[in-house]
Regions:
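Catalytic domains of carbohydrate-active enzymes, especially glycoside hydrolases
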Residues: 1-6, 113-119, 204-211, 272-273
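Aromatic-lined substrate-binding rim segments of carbohydrate-active enzymes
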Residues: 2-51, 146-173
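Aromatic- and acidic-residue-enriched segments that line the glycan-binding/catalytic groove
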Residues: 6-22, 54-87, 124-147
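The substrate-binding groove and active-site-proximal loops of carbohydrate-active enzymes
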Residues: 12-29, 86-105, 147-158, 213-220, ...
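Active-site-adjacent "subsite" loops/lids of carbohydrate-active enzymes
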Residues: 25, 30-37, 47-48, 53-114
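Conserved, mostly hydrophobic/aromatic
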Residues: 39, 104, 111, 120-123, ...
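Short, acidic/polar
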Residues: 98-113, 189-206, 226, 258-272
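Glycoside hydrolase catalytic-domain groove-lining segments
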Residues: 131-258
């Protein structure tokens, strides 16, 4: 689910342009069924991958059929700007609302029900902005009802609740399925500007089964060198129920180039060549 769409025929999300070429077109085949089958034939584990919050562009959403919640929210002047919010020309889902969280979880449950996935994976597109206007109405309602959290903590709590529900749903869908998240390597940005509380998720039971930080920085990066970032995430883990999996970039392994690892060391580091 790259942009509030679907790589398979879904009752909840429109087909992704990555499959059909343009928003609003029907599916001609099911690539997810094919990928899952081919992966398992090769003894590979495969997880359903979602971007829960990131949606589509203004141009794309206007092509979506009215049967889907994302288009219904766009067409409703009371919900557009609340359930879905435009940031720099792209629409994002706002997890401050139960209805939005319900859609995200239902979409993930649908994928796990329809296909023989081994787990669920949540990518790193969390809050797209620090601007208070993103969820101003939801936050004002929260304060009016007696809520005392600062905006940053309000947003982290919204993400915490979403992550908790996704983890719980994944575990209930089938014994042995796991749920994990791949935050960025810049932990300060992840926590302070994207409002993802990776410390909580890694520190206690019930949120994730694994953390897979995107450690795309080479050994010579001035602030976020590979070893430093790996150790930062390793130190976060305070429970035996969470595993650390290092997310590495296939792009640099393919190209053999990395501005933060010099010379032949780049190719050797990323792909062992």
């Amino acid at each position: 689910r790259p942009n509030a769409d679907s790589m398979y025929p879904s009752k909840l999300y429109p087909m992704s342009p990555y499959v059909v070429g343009q928003s609003g077109r029907p599916a001609q085949y099911d690539p997810v069924a094919l990928i899952v089958r081919l992966a398992h034939e090769r003894s590979l584990s495969i997880h359903a991958w979602i971007n829960p919050m990131r949606g589509m562009t203004e141009e794309e959403i206007q092509l979506v059929e009215g049967e889907y919640p994302i288009r219904q929210w766009y067409d409703d002047p009371q919900l557009r700007g609340r359930y879905i919010v435009s940031v720099d020309g792209r629409w994002y889902l706002n997890p401050a609302y139960d209805e939005v969280v319900d859609l995200i979880c239902a979409g993930a449950e649908e994928a796990l029900r329809l296909y023989d996935f081994d787990g669920l994976h949540m990518d790193d597109y969390f809050y797209p902005t620090t601007d208070p206007s993103f969820d101003a109405d939801a936050y004002a309602s929260y304060q009016a009802s007696g809520g005392a959290l600062e905006l940053a903590e309000f947003r982290r709590k919204a993400l915490d609740d979403l992550v908790y529900q996704l983890h719980e749903m994944t575990g209930k869908s089938r014994v042995g399925r796991i749920f994990g998240i791949s935050p960025g390597g810049n932990v300060d940005r992840v926590f302070h500007t994207q409002y993802a509380d990776v410390y909580l998720w890694c520190g206690v039971d019930g949120y994730i089964d694994y953390i897979c930080p995107q450690v795309y920085f080479g050994l010579e990066h001035g602030s976020y060198d590979f070893v430093k970032v790996c150790r930062t995430y390793q130190d976060m883990i305070q429970t035996d129920s969470v595993d650390l999996i290092i997310g590495m970039t296939f792009g640099k392994a393919f190209s053999g180039e990395d501005p933060w690892t010099s010379g032949r060391a780049a190719r050797t580091f990323w792909c062992g060549a």
